[in-house]
Amino acid sequence: MTMLATKKDPMIVSMGPQHPSMHGVLRLIVTSDGENVIDCEPILGYLHRGMEKIAENRTIIQYLPYVTRWDYLATMFTEAITVNAPEKLANIQIPKRASYIRIIMLELSRIASHLLWLGPFMADVGAQTPFFYIFREREMIYDLFEAATGMRMMHNYFRIGGVAVDFPYGWVDKCLDFCDYFLPKVDEYEQLITNNPIFLKRVEGVGFIGREEAINWGLSGPMLRASGVRWDLRKVDHYECYDELDWQIQWQKEGDSLARYLVRIGEMRESVRIIQQALKVIPGGPYENLEARRLNQQKDSEWNDFDYQFISKKSSPTFKLPKQEHYVRIEAPKGELGIFLIGDDNVSPWRWKIRPPGFINLQILPQLVKGMKLADIMTILGSIDIIMGEVDR
């Protein structure tokens, strides 16, 4: 009996782009042989809005509302790096109380970001229940944000030299109540998820990244710490007042999707510890360095000249960036968020280069999915934790 020779061509599957509220406008062109992935090519740029060029035509305060649109699930971090860069460039000191307020807000934002990673990630691997649980806790964090800043998501709260407003009356007690409520909920998540045999089969050994490989690819955040590298910029760069608080770097050595899940679960616990300590030792005093608003220049006499006498509204003085360059970075929920800033003694930056963690971490995706099954693509992509707003900028 003669067998018919069949020719097998690889199949090309286009995954995405999805809506920004789902997995984001990332398109993957996947080449597969049946269920096995041969190649994967990410197509970026669907959410590119020219954020770096916008910065060059705005003052820092004018630019602050724009930066919350990079990583729109952890907006406190994009605001923090936007004011940290000019502060470091001009050597502006911030009050101790403002630094503690920043730490509390940043760690709340870190928890909210990890929660909204956990829910969709679990839905991707087939567990729907945690998706509904995480929104319950995340809503409480957003209530705290709304009480302190007036906005649930795009806060516009950080300022050069401090923060916009102090905590309202009773906010500290509400935040402590949330911490006491949230810690048992993290234990509940772990009981529900970590030892689940179906979950373990979907994530254990999937998307493995070795220690040297993670360093060579320039990975950061939970992606790096899950591969056995104890690297956290809060410990390395000693910014704000993190050194005055007792907390540990969360890391794992396995390097797979399960390790990245465990790192983020551990980080939520550590963030609660940081918030509880900061709320108990937060000092009094001003919440903003008002001296940062002053200008080191003489009174400009040309405004009194004949040519300007009919101008009804003269431009108000604003913060000028010194003629220097500087790179500033912070530990965002997804990794190292950095700004390379060049000032030229003007109110607007000459160059504003954004180093987003998601963009760098995403580059390793094609290598991770080669040789895996099609169903593993969503598991690996979910474990990287990307937001296309900061990837495309």
Swiss-Prot record:
One of its GO terms (cellular component) is chloroplast thylakoid membrane. It is a peripheral membrane protein. NDH shuttles electrons from NAD(P)H:plastoquinone, via FMN and iron-sulfur (Fe-S) centers, to quinones in the photosynthetic chain and possibly in a chloroplast respiratory chain. The immediate electron acceptor for the enzyme in this species is believed to be plastoquinone. Couples the redox reaction to proton translocation, and thus conserves the redox energy in a proton gradient. Its main location: plastid. NDH is composed of at least 16 different subunits, 5 of which are encoded in the nucleus. It comes from the Eukaryota. GO terms for biological process: photosynthesis, light reaction. This is NAD(P)H-quinone oxidoreductase subunit H, chloroplastic.
